[in-house]
Each structure stands twice: as C-alpha cells, then as structure tokens.
C-alpha cells in the first residue's frame, strides 16, 4: 500500500465514521430505554411528569392498597376461625378429662353439658 493511498482512505472513511458514530450512540441509548418497561425499576430525570403516568401510578397504588386490605381481611377471618376451633378443642379436652362423670361433650353446640340436667357446666 502506498503512502498516498492513506490520505485517500481517510478522506473516504472519515465522513462515514463521523456519520456512523452518532447513529451508534443513539442506538445504544434506544436499546437502554427499551429495557425500561412498566413495572421495572428505571430512573429517568424529568421525563415522567405527564398526567397520564401520574394517573397510572395513582391507580396502581390504589389497587395495591385494595389488595393489601383484602388480604388482611382474609387473614383476620382465617385467624378468627382458627382461634374459635382451637378454643372448642381445648374445651372438649377439658370436658373429656373432667372428674365429673355426668359431663359430656355436645359436638353440635360445642359445649360441655351435664347428663342429668342438660345444663352447661365448666369442668
């Protein structure tokens, strides 16, 4: 390769490189912004101040709050039912271990009753 062909190559490829560099830079920036989808954690400066994104964020927060409240209600109900069942089992065990021979456990009402009078007793 002659030395005179090097300046000719630079004259041809330098403008191409100058045009290609900003395009390559822009492609990388677009590829990075394409990874920021809804629900992912992305940081942007001043770009999301439009009313639609604020409304979507408000609706998302409201939906999360409603779901959280509903989950708490379901958990409280399950805990309440478990406590009720647990107390009934403890009362049944106490009735069965009672020294009173006339005490028996009534499963329908979940009470310890006296065989003779039918009244509730505390063993």
From Swiss-Prot:
Pfam families, per database record: DUF1283
Signal listed as a keyword: yes
Keywords: Signal
Signal peptide limits: 1-31
Database matches in InterPro entries: DUF1283
Region (Disordered): 47-66
Covalent S-S links between cysteines: none
Assigned protein family: Belongs to the UPF0482 family.
Protein name in UniProt: UPF0482 protein YE2026
Organism the protein comes from: Yersinia enterocolitica serotype O:8 / biotype 1B (strain NCTC 13174 / 8081)
């Amino acid at each position: 390769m002659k030395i005179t062909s090097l300046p000719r190559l630079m004259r041809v490829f330098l403008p191409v490189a100058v045009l290609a560099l900003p395009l390559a830079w822009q492609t990388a920036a677009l590829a990075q912004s394409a990874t920021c989808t809804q629900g992912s954690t992305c940081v942007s400066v001043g770009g999301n101040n439009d009313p639609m994104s604020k409304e979507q964020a408000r609706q998302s927060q409201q939906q999360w709050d409603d779901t959280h409240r509903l989950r708490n209600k379901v958990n409280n109900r399950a805990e309440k039912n478990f406590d009720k069942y647990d107390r009934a089992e403890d009362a049944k065990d106490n009735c069965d271990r009672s020294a009173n021979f006339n005490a028996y456990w009534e499963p329908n009402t979940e009470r310890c009753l006296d065989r003779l009078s039918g009244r509730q007793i505390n063993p």
